[in-house]
Amino acid sequence: MPAIEQEALRLAHGNILDVGGGAGCHSLALQQMGKQVTAIDISPLAVATMRERGVQDALEEDFFTHEGQYDTILMLMNGIGIVGTLKRLPAFFMQVDRLLTPGGEVLCDSSDICYVFEDKDGFIDLTGIDGYYGELTYRMQYKDIKGDPFPWLFIDPDTLTEQARANGFHTEVIARGGHYDYLARITRLKR
């Protein structure tokens, strides 16, 4: 597990929501640390896998409609990517505001994928890019089975900070990885 993810697990506290739990690696690690965690994923197969692997509280739910109160919302492996586009960030922050307890926090990681546009001289050329360069469309495929395309967001730390502030939140980059990746803590601005 990358150092950034290990740091997030160490910092996670109280009642924890693991968003996009996948196969459950983070929830299982949190359980082994004696921490209380609820894992959610929209994939019924992912939830079944988590349960088979021993995740005690795994739910098939969408983050944007999930209800509950959490001290830590964990969004790892570029988990904030579920937002899809910058335009959906206000809805994301509204949901975070509903889910967080007073003093609660989001721990999320992402990558600034500007390096994809870097030329051989190290210049990053974003000319000709329509919209924000971190908004991508993914399509999963296994052998001949293809899923539907879906939007995914890679957000650079400056844009995340600006968007968070515009929606009543503070962002602090608390760790950086070796390849444009970072771990951020998002908390409510003091009102």
Task: For every predicted segment, state its role.
Residues 23-34:
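Conserved SAM-binding loop of SAM-dependent methyltransferases across substrates and taxa
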Residues 43-44:
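Conserved SAM/SAH-binding beta-strand->alpha-helix loop
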Residues 89-102:
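A short glycine-rich, Lys/Arg-flanked "PGG" loop and its adjoining helix->strand segment in the class I
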Residues 167-191:
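Core SAM-dependent methyltransferase catalytic element
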Residues 1-15:
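Conserved alpha-helix/loop element of class I SAM-dependent methyltransferases that forms part
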Residues 70-90:
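A short SAM/SAH-binding and catalytic strip from SAM-dependent methyltransferases
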Residues 101-162:
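SAM-dependent methyltransferase
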Residues 54-64:
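Conserved SAM-binding strand-loop segment of SAM-dependent methyltransferases
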